[in-house]
Amino acid sequence: MRVVVQRVKSSKVEVDGKIIGSIKGGLNVLLGICKGDTQKDIEYLVDKILGLRIFEDECGKMNKSLLDVKGELLVISQFTLYGDCRKGKRPSFIEALGGEEAKKLYEEFIKKCKEVLGEVQMGEFGADMLVSIENDGPVTLMIDSKKVF
């Protein structure tokens, strides 16, 4: 499982011209799920993301987490995070988990986040979405639960 975590001033996701999720400040998380991902991957990433100290403290140092600043969270499924571009010009998505299995893990990820935060904004799994992100910093991090990078 891998994520792209972005500290944002605001972020929103639209499906068919309707805003289905939006936040004013916090973290935008793009979530990719691959074959072999389990509950352990979810637990690792939720703990890591919610505890990341990437918000500034009173001295301007990145020292506070999303929980510390009472920020909001927007999670969007993104199978293309497992696009393999090493051969040819067209990405291969063979490692990405699809269908109901991936949806179940995505929903479990959201559930774990909600257990800590109470409320979580989200995209629509499998939908064609328009995502607007106003980066803050910018601060953008990639995390892989298998610690590939």
UniProtKB/Swiss-Prot annotation:
Phosphoprotein listed as a keyword: no
UniProt-listed GO biological process terms: D-amino acid catabolic process
Reactions this protein catalyses: glycyl-tRNA(Ala) + H2O = tRNA(Ala) + glycine + H(+); a D-aminoacyl-tRNA + H2O = a tRNA + a D-alpha-amino acid + H(+)
Top-level taxonomic group: Bacteria
E.C. code: 3.1.1.96
Motif Gly-cisPro motif, important for rejection of L-amino acids, residue range(s) on this chain: 137-138
InterPro entries, per the entry: Daa-tRNA_deacyls_DTD, DTD-like_sf
Similarity field: Belongs to the DTD family.
UniProt-listed PANTHER family: D-AMINOACYL-TRNA DEACYLASE 1, D-TYROSYL-TRNA TYR DEACYLASE
Name the UniProt record assigns to this protein: D-aminoacyl-tRNA deacylase
